[in-house]
UniProtKB/Swiss-Prot annotation:
UniProt protein name: ATP-dependent protease subunit HslV
Transmembrane segments: none
HAMAP family, sorted: HslV (MF_00248)
Native organism: Rickettsia peacockii (strain Rustic)
Gene Ontology biological-process entries: proteolysis involved in protein catabolic process
Chief location bin: cytoplasm
Activity regulation description: Allosterically activated by HslU binding.
GO cellular component: HslUV protease complex; proteasome core complex
GO MF term set: metal ion binding; threonine-type endopeptidase activity
Amino acid sequence: MSDNLSLHGTTILCLKKNEEIIIAADGQVSHGNTVLKSTARKLRTIANNKIIAGFAGSTADGLALFEKLAVKIEQHKHNLLRSAVELAKDWRSDKYLRRLEAMMIVADRSHILILTGNGDVVEPEKNVAAIGSGGLFALSAARALMSYENNLTAEEIALKSMNIAADLCVFSNHNIIMEKVV
């Protein structure tokens, strides 16, 4: 069985509503068709919770990229956009980094960014982004809830969307962890 299944075996969702920014992740770690762990933490904070990152893909690769992003953020005085672009440049040009199999969503008060395995930096539309095998389910649910359920908070939308994704994606579970950008 190919290890490529582990590349997308998770759900990470980030959304902004009424100046509240939430990143959510499921807790399942899979290898092929086997669940290795159900309580993993796929979210990390930088700069006293001012920047939060979630990663999908190889755990070791995701952590390596997170560490490199943290260094860039310190170098560029907590400027997330510039740090992400500089990381993407390194990701594309470095022989070792090009082989990493991970994607990240990072957010601060001003930006939600997707960092792809190709070294792309994408700022999504409509204040919502998702990655991983359950990402499209979570993204669709969040967009629908944001459009039609005006009384829900960002946290409620994230939780409902993640639960829908976990119902549909066999590589995601209902052990949802959420972090709020402060």
